[in-house]
């Protein structure tokens, strides 16, 4: 008897589904791309339970006949290609004929569809890949597909899913990218009957960009349009002031397909050069058009990764065009990018509302009085702040805090820094200090960063906040808004007072007292990027440490700021009291020591 057997259709279907359908966002991608290929001008997506309970996609495309509907759920059945030669010039988003049967293999599906010239439509039901019912139905032209109980017959895969809110955020993020790729199509996303995303389908990319990222970001984008050597480029580059800590806001579209292409993303970053600080990434939406023969999309069932056959040439050409575009435009941020006044309120506003989840309720802060205590200023008063015995004594208390479960530890104690005396400032970056055992060179920014970081951690998770005289409006994309709603308590514990303003808009009313003016929006966006990089592995303690490091970096005295001798000595004294004085929170060295013995050897004594 042969050991090798041909698998039954059900088992083969589940294996194929494992490649194509990784999670709800995979289903959304395949269904929406089918709607796009069908010529839809409007696509509506409804989600329940993050897509695990139900995903509905409604479009006004060409629809299917009864015969095509049945064939569409057969493996390797497609209307997109006819022969192998067509694989060399694919112009549609789908072509493999695997998506619908793979989705049907791990879910329960209901489909209603009608072509424009038909008097009636067709309704069909599938479960576990099997057709269980079919008949006529009255419905508008187009197709409506509802996928229920995703992974109901693969419990191991279902258990591996994230929380519904996280899965829903992934779905919303993908639809946002598709809206950028196809600005001529109107996209809508609804959750429990409430519309959470809408793009107008005007055909203008800037309108879709405003729908995804908000009008504030759209207003700071630089238009790029060029044609060179068979490459057509159309899109927008964000000014350096919009930079992020991850590539989450780089959207690459090739031949109308949203893709991940590291070479193109690197070319976009390379075009900015020194316009961006180290570790920062631009905001960019670029649509490239190349000959279909130069684009291989048949390298993965999900069709998200592609291969450009002249990748190096295309990336080099693109980088040059983008450099020219950035050089031609003013990239200095306008005054409108920064919050006007940027003043803190010492009196606590009664009844400030902090949104803490979708329908989960509103947390109201208790009323508070006013205080006449001094609040330290921003960078211009940095020398005064450095000499204060305890900066916490001069800041109004938080109006509302949660009890800290524990105080985050920031590492085992190491050898203490000896007593140092400041000798000179050279250049206004490093402090030259003398100790009993040699000469010390101290990075003033890294040292102050370490001090602030440990002060934040030592206070636990109940951070004091300062209210802003003028709240900062945050226009987020759907993914960011979902993260903020889900993790709002974490932000509150870190010292941020945030109010949901409706849709994907929030008001930042208060910030940790250490944060200098003008950094409010950027720190929130960086903290949201943290969750994208960590995913489900983000714990509250790790988030608090990361937030403390980010706040400390933005609050510390900068390289190039001149300090008086008393201020330098105060900084050194505070540094010696830290648990880890030799590195900053990001791991960079704070102190370099030249012992007397090393100096004697250098001078050959």
Curated annotation (Swiss-Prot):
InterPro entries from the UniProt entry: DNA_mismatch_repair_CS (IPR014762), DNA_mismatch_repair_MutL (IPR020667), DNA_mismatch_S5_2-like (IPR013507), HATPase_C_sf (IPR036890), MutL/Mlh/PMS (IPR002099), MutL/Mlh/Pms-like (IPR038973), MutL_C (IPR014790), MutL_C_dimsub (IPR042120)
GO biological process: mismatch repair
Sorted UniProt keywords: DNA damage, DNA repair
A GO CC term assigned to this protein in UniProt: mismatch repair complex
Gene Ontology terms for molecular function: ATP binding; ATP hydrolysis activity; ATP-dependent DNA damage sensor activity; mismatched DNA binding
Transmembrane residue ranges: none
Pfam families to which the protein is assigned, alphabetical: DNA_mis_repair, HATPase_c_3, MutL_C
Alphabetized NCBIfam families for the sequence: mutl (TIGR00585)
Protein's job: This protein is involved in the repair of mismatches in DNA. It is required for dam-dependent methyl-directed DNA mismatch repair. May act as a 'molecular matchmaker', a protein that promotes the formation of a stable complex between two or more DNA-binding proteins in an ATP-dependent manner without itself being part of a final effector complex.
Similarity comment: family membership: Belongs to the DNA mismatch repair MutL/HexB family.
Protein's UniProt name: DNA mismatch repair protein MutL
């Amino acid at each position: 008897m042969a050991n090798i057997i041909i698998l039954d259709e059900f088992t083969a279907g589940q294996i194929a589904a494992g490649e194509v359908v990784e999670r709800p966002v995979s289903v959304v991608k395949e269904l929406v791309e089918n709607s796009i290929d069908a010529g839809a001008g409007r696509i509506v997506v409804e989600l329940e339970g993050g897509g695990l309970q139900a995903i509905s996609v409604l479009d006004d495309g060409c629809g299917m006949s009864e015969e095509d509907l049945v064939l569409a759920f057969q493996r390797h059945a497609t209307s997109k290609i006819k022969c192998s030669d067509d694989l060399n010039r694919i112009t549609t988003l789908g072509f493999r004929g695997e998506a619908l049967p793979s989705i049907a293999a791990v879910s329960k599906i209901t489909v209603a569809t009608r072509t424009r010239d038909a008097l009636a439509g067709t309704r069909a039901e599938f479960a576990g890949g099997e057709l269980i019912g079919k008949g006529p139905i009255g419905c508008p032209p187009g197709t409506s597909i509802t996928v229920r109980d995703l992974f109901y017959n693969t419990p191991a895969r279902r258990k591996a899913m994230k929380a519904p809110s996280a899965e829903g955020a992934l779905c919303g993020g993908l639809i946002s990218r598709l809206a950028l790729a196809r600005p001529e199509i109107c996209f809508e996303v609804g959750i429990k009957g409430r519309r959470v995303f809408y793009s107008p389908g005007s055909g203008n990319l800037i309108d879709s960009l405003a729908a995804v990222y908000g009008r504030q970001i759209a207003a700071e984008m630089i238009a790029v349009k060029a044609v060179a050597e068979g490459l057509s480029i159309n899109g927008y580059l964000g000014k350096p002031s919009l930079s992020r800590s991850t590539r989450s806001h780089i959207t690459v579209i090739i031949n109308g397909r949203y893709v991940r292409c590291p070479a193109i993303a690197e070319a976009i970053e390379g075009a900015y050069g020194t316009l961006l600080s180290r570790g920062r990434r631009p905001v960019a939406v670029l649509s490239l058009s190349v000959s279909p023969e130069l684009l291989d999309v048949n390298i993965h069932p999900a069709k998200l990764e592609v291969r450009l056959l002249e990748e190096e040439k295309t990336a080099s050409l693109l980088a040059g065009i983008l450099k020219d575009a950035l050089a031609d435009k003013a990239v200095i941020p306008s005054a409108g990018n920064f919050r006007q006044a940027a003043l803190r309120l010492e009196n606590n506003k009664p009844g400030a509302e902090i949104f803490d989840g979708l329908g989960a309720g509103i947390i109201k802060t208790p009323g508070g009085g006013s205080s006449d205590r001094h609040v330290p200023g921003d960078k211009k008063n940095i020398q005064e702040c450095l000499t204060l015995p305890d900066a916490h004594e001069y800041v109004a208390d938080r109006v509302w805090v949660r009890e800290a479960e524990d105080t985050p530890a920031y590492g085992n104690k190491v050898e203490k820094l000896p007593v140092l005396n400041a000798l000179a400032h050279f250049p206004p970056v490093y402090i030259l200090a003398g100790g009993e055992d040699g000469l010390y060179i101290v990075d003033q920014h890294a040292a102050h960063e370490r001090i602030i970081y440990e002060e934040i951690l030592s206070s636990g998770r109940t951070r004091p906040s300062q209210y802003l005289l003028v709240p900062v409006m945050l226009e987020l994309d759907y993914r960011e808004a979902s993260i903020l709603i889900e993790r709002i308590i974490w932000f509150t514990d870190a010292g941020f007072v945030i109010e949901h303003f409706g849709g994907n808009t929030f008001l930042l009313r208060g910030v940790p007292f250490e944060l200098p003016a003008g950094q409010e929006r950027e720190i929130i966006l960086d903290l949201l990027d943290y969750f994208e990089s960590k995913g489900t592995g983000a714990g509250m303690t790790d988030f608090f440490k990361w937030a403390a490091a980010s706040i400390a970096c933005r609050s510390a005295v900068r390289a190039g700021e001149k300090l008086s001798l008393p201020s330098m000595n105060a900084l050194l004294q505070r540094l010696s009291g830290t648990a880890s004085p030799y590195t900053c929170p990001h791991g960079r060295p704070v102190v370099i020591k030249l012992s007397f013995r090393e100096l004697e050897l250098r001078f050959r004594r």
